[in-house]
Amino acid sequence: VLPTVEKMLRSMPIEEMCSYAPIGGIPGFNEAVQISLFGHVSERFHVESVPTPGGCGALRHAIWNFLDNGDSMLTTDWIWGPYRNICEEHGRFLKDFPMFNDQDGFNVEGMEDGLRELLEKQKQVLLLLNTPANNPTGYSMTKEEMDKVVDVLKKLAAEYPDRRLTFCLDVSYIDFDGTFEETRSIFDSIHDMPENMMTLVVFSMSKSYTMCGMRCGAIVCLAETKEAADLFK
């Protein structure tokens, strides 16, 4: 445990530590999440955050709220095993695509093929990517790869205007790979997203602050408009 985290926890009144928190989080929670993620309160996005029991709780919210019963979520073939369990527990399924191409880079083409297959038969499609520091491979997508992913998503959103696309980034290990500026560069690719698309971030403060057993996380919406952020909330 980081000494600064332990010091802060031990300085808190026991009543504050043990009492119920509001469903929407204590005052200042949304700003605190943004500062942890971006280093400041975002001016690029309309951001809303919902507290969850760790990153796992955020994943559950994404799968339950942004897929219909019987739908499949798309992700890579290298995954944290409980992704599949969470899907199946909530009446959803997991579809994967090969994570790496022949050049050992991220397989954008395989991702697009998987998305097209789901868009043909589902009204809602959820793409989940775990980066930086993918569990279990440790792979971090480059800025160029993330740019290509977002370009594909924008193209498909335009081709399927009656579908609802959700792009979910699981950044549970974002603070375990590279400098703050390097790891946050993945967010630079996310801009000018279409109206029929939602961008979510799975954030695990439990991991970032080295207190995994305390189960503190958030599902975060990065919206282009206030109306979209309010709808998420």
Segment roles from a protein language model:
Residues H191-K233:
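Conserved core segment of the aminotransferase class I/II
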Residues T75-D77, L169, F203, C221:
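Short beta-strand/turn micro-motifs composed of small residues
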